[in-house]
Amino acid sequence: MSKKYFGTDGIRGEFSVPPLTENFFILLGAAIAKSLLQFKHCKKRILFGCDTRESSYKIINLISLGLNSEECSISNAGIISTPAIAFYTKKNKYDLGIVVSASHNLYKDNGIKIFDKDGYKITFEDENHIENYIEKLVNENYQCKKSNYNLIDVSEDIQKEYTEFCLKNINLNKSANNNIKLTLDLANGANFKVGKDIFNKAGFLVNCYNDKPNGKNINDRCGSTYLKNLPDQIKKDCSEYGISMDGDGDRVVIVDKYNNILDGDDILYTIVRGKIINHETVSGVVGTTMTNYALEIYLKKEGIEFIRTNVGDKYVLDEMKKNGYDLGGETSGHILMLNYSTSGDSILAALQFLFYSDILAKNKINSILEKYPQKITNIFFKQDLQENIINITIKEASEKFLNKDLRLIIRKSGTENCIRIMVEAKDKGIVENMSMKIKDYIEDKLKALS
């Protein structure tokens, strides 16, 4: 069933532009309360957290108005990462955790991610229930009763408890870390404060960039989707690695001192290979359709089962839970480690990478996965472009360029108004040539149909 509001990762779009108007968020709050908080023994305790966008606190207040129609007890963690909300929701027995964020998007966009009492993102069925209630409230011309509500401030508690959790529950070698310099790109986002604190306490020598959010500079020419400046910063700091997070802190990309970009596939490879050397069990790994084929080959060679899902960390998580696996992730840098966390976590993933890369280095093994050449191309389109035009274009392009010598994924993004093309082959020339041909074909097709 196609959803009207929820995408690959929650609800996301430009704030105050339909459908994400102020009234929508009030309706959303009421719909959440009426659809997800009616079960027996529910105490209606809600936890909010947000990233640094200028609209985030306003959205928290709007959703709270709707939630308060069902007399909820609402706590506000302030600016904090998505994984920290997942952790704190479960630890402190909230019924729901709600993150106001648009992840790696620029500041004009915003949205929400919702976690259940166990710290997992709500199910597709839950999303359908919320959407159905929103439509019902719209049809009933629902008017929110003005009422006073209190937001209980838990911002200091969550930062303290999350920091302790990261440092106590992850593999660390503090004595070895003392000589390791790191450059942190904090994306002017949710980890701008706690990220620096955790890496310092873990024993690293840290230099931070993009740690001065102003409400409008989140992910702006920085963070895990913009690595252009990081190599120069690493060189200036004489760092071993640059750790680049996204705006809400649930994904990470790493750059080493030789300018090698280590994405989610490299991070998974390093963790798995380090675990094997360390005589730790790896039951299986979950990736997505975008995961580089080289990782699949390596895992099979080691006798480790590998499963692919659709793009989206929720799909990865579902498959991990179904198969009892602890490790999974996306090329984009969402790394899931269920023995530590219920959500992708940039800080935990980076700490794990650093621990296992040290083990590999001591055994004179490279942390870099020798990948098949791969290229991802994004074609952006206007928000009002009809869904059927997009679907027809993707279908026809996928059929036209089907080729036994390459792996091709063409899909509509679940988080942005764009079509993503992934071309992978053994030969780099084929990848470049086919990427250009497919891009030109899709652009011409969209122009002709719209």
What are these regions (language model features)?
Residues 1, 14, 110-234:
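Gly/Ser/Thr-enriched, mixed-charge loops and adjacent short helices
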Residues 277-450:
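Phosphate-binding and adjacent anionic-ligand microenvironments
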Residues 34, 42-109, 197-255:
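N-terminal small/polar loop signature for handling phosphorylated ligands or for N-terminal nucleophile
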Residues 1-65, 69-71, 96, 152-182, ...:
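An N-terminal, well-structured beta->alpha segment
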Residues 95-109, 234-256, 260-261, 306-345:
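Glycine-rich phosphate-binding loop
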Residues 74-83, 261-264, 288, 309-310:
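Active-site nucleophile and cofactor-binding loops and adjacent substrate-binding regions
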